[in-house]
Amino acid sequence: GVSFGGLIMQEVSKIINAKKVIIISSVKSRKELSNSMKFARKTKSYKFLPLSWIDDFENLIAFVFGPKIKKRVNLYKKYLSVRDQKYLDWSIDKIVNWDQEEPIKNVIHIHGTYDLIFPIINLKNYIPIKKGDHAVILKRADWLNEYFSKNLA
């Protein structure tokens, strides 16, 4: 599972008997959430995020930074296509209020060292992708393919 999908897969693994759960750009417990997410949980400030700006923000970034960024933005739009505001509000609530106290035992956690969504400062027991950000699954697919070929075969 990637990002929020990592949380979902860990919850699914409590229902089915998974041998391993692989998460990328995610967290293994609420202790690993960013300090801003922990603050948002306590204050409920996440309820006031204006998520409708996402599409307009992407268009602004593409306009300001040019074709190279526009290509990257289009890639994100293709692979990160769930943008419904109700879904985003719901998923942020589920992430911020996740009640997983301790990591489950069978998790393989791969994480970029430059991830700003889930910064590594709070993470333990993960496989680092140097200079990888939250979108390592898109930007570092070669590294991931090589890792999986060597370690999961």
Can you name each region flagged by the protein language model?
Residues G1-M9:
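Gly/Ala-rich beta-loop-alpha elbow adjacent to hydrolase catalytic centers
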Residues M9-K14, N145-E146:
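Short, hydrophobic alpha-helix immediately C-terminal to the catalytic nucleophile
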Residues S13-I15, E101-I104, I117-N125:
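Short loop/helix-cap segments at secondary-structure boundaries that form the rim of catalytic
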Residues H109-H111, D115:
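Short beta-strand/loop motif that positions the catalytic acidic residue
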Residues F148-A153:
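Short, hydrophobic alpha-helical segments
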